[in-house]
């Protein structure tokens, strides 16, 4: 009987051998060289070959800019040479939907044209709806190894993580127990250049696939608008808020209406350990983000309320 460790040995040694003939010959050769002393019969070779087959990791890609967005298509093209990719994304832009999901309308799921060889589906729902639909309808036989969101047209640094549909995908994936990463570029242009991000995206994806992420932790990755980057900063979320958010206008018919506008105002512009600082100074910002939002510092202090109320 072939021992389990032989399967691992064969798997490592045959990673570059792709044809059936090569695999069969190598299986027999390894059986002899590792002390089994004879070639295996066809049934045993088939058993070993099945163990040797290395499946590509399966990655779900979504976003909040829509399945047609250049950022999503660029991300898929960065992955398909080493991963099986499935896309399920909104049929139009759904920026700012955060963790929203649909309860008052039926959802549609439509097959679209492949991107870089990856199958693409779109939905009329939110980014989170797309994740839920993908798990309900697209992964019946095999679960994804990783969930990715982006690449977003515009950054999602600092408090934007709470509003972001891009990170809504990531948080939903994390809630389901899957390693999840969001990618964003600080360039809202629909024709933004995503090529400088390629080596960093691929490296981060490979690291997460190999090492995993802690339970209930996902990653928020933001890139500055640049052709080259100074490096990577693993940092914390910047504190701040949006100001002057509502732009008031008057309709020709005489009533007022509003556009959401404004800008982000940092509460700690000089702090050098934040994503906001990293982006302003030309670094890729990686923020490990927790799902558990409990404030443990306050938990014990407020325990007294249990007796006082």
Identify what each model region corresponds to.
Residues 28-30, 39:
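Cysteine-centered motifs
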Residues 38-51:
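Short, Lys/Arg-enriched N-terminal segments with co-localized hydrophobic residues
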Residues 174-196:
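Glycine-rich phosphate/pyrophosphate-binding loops
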Residues 53-55, 59, 70-137, 141-142:
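A cross-family phosphate/adenosyl-ligand binding-site feature
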Residues 195-309:
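Electrostatically charged, flexible surface regions
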Residues 155-164:
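Glycine/threonine-rich flexible loop motifs
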